[in-house]
Amino acid sequence: MLPALAGPAPSGGEGTVEGIGEALGRSQGGFSTKLHLRAEGGGKPVAAVLTAGERHEQFALDALMDKGAVPRSGRGRPRLRPRRTAGDRGYSSPPARRRLRQRRIEPVIPTRKDQPRQPDFDKAAYRQRNKVERLIGRLKQYRRIATRYEKRATNYLAMVTLGMTMLWLT
């Protein structure tokens, strides 16, 4: 018998870390969940990560970069590491930029008002982030994704993955 399976199974919310395990966070309107997406250059979804609503975006960055491979246009293995990544101001923090540079990924993230400006910010590359925003809009057309009906984060992530698959097929 395995030690982890010995004894009664936890009931209710026992054994789970609230807000992290089920990606439920508190906001003024009640519970909230953030959906972080990674898309390839054409705007197709590659990976998704869920976090609690009040969690900072930088905590999802590593998990998002570890997931998904982008198929190459020609022959060869899929790319696991993008050359650059564009994100909104929520991802703008020195630790997040440092972790992206350690992975040899150029961060194209505008700085927040309380941070010093970047002299080498690429506005043309940042405009490509529009594809991710449109991807989120297309995913939210599915009512089940726009409104989280599922109690469990794994079930909600399964619905998001199903929606991402539908977008790849259309």
Locate each region found by the language model.
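Polybasic low-complexity intrinsically disordered regions
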Residues: M1-R112, G163-M164
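Short, charged, surface-exposed secondary-structure boundary motifs
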Residues: P116-F121
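Basic, amphipathic alpha-helical segments enriched in Lys/Arg and hydrophobic/aromatic residues
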Residues: R98-R104, K123-T170
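Short hydrophobic "helix-edge" motifs at membrane interfaces and signal-peptide entry regions
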Residues: P78-R79, D122-A124
